[in-house]
UniProtKB/Swiss-Prot annotation:
GO biological process, one term: translation
Family: Belongs to the universal ribosomal protein uL24 family.
Residues annotated as signal peptide: none
GO CC terms in record: ribonucleoprotein complex; ribosome
Keywords on record: Ribonucleoprotein, Ribosomal protein, RNA-binding, rRNA-binding
CDD domains xref list: KOW_RPL26
Taxonomic lineage of the native organism: Bacteria, Pseudomonadati, Pseudomonadota, Betaproteobacteria, Burkholderiales
Descriptive protein name: Large ribosomal subunit protein uL24
Organism: Ralstonia pickettii (strain 12J)
Self-association and partners: Part of the 50S ribosomal subunit.
SUPFAM superfamilies xrefs: Translation proteins SH3-like domain
HAMAP family: Ribosomal_uL24_B
Stored PANTHER family: MITOCHONDRIAL RIBOSOMAL PROTEIN L24 (PTHR12903)
One GO molecular-function entry: structural constituent of ribosome
């Protein structure tokens, strides 16, 4: 069970975007893309076959999953634990004990 999923509200713990909060857009094997975090400028060539124009575009780049933490109701970063009740696994915040994404 993944501890961080698409749609979760996270905060960046390390790096140039430390302290920024955003929503997880995608989860890859060990990386996540977070809305508005780690934005890079990419040069795109024009493609007349597709009708796209060239130029410099902003692209959201993935960051390692260990560099983000879920945000609790108080806006503080929290680790995530797994709780099993009746054979059903649920994600639980370590700081408050509240269930995540219920």
């Amino acid at each position: 069970m993944n501890k961080i999923r698409k749609g979760d509200r996270v905060i960046v713990r390390t790096g140039k975007d430390k302290g920024k909060q955003g929503t997880v857009l995608a989860v890859l094997a060990e990386h996540v893309t977070v809305e508005g975090v780690n934005v890079a400028k990419k040069h795109v060539r024009p493609n007349p076959m597709l009708g796209t124009t060239g130029g410099v575009v902003d692209k959201i780049m993935p960051i390692h999953i260990s560099n983000v933490a879920l945000v609790d109701a108080n806006g503080k970063p929290s680790r995530v634990g797994i709780k099993v009740e009746g054979g059903v696994k649920t994600r639980v915040l370590k700081t408050t004990g509240a269930a995540v994404g219920a």
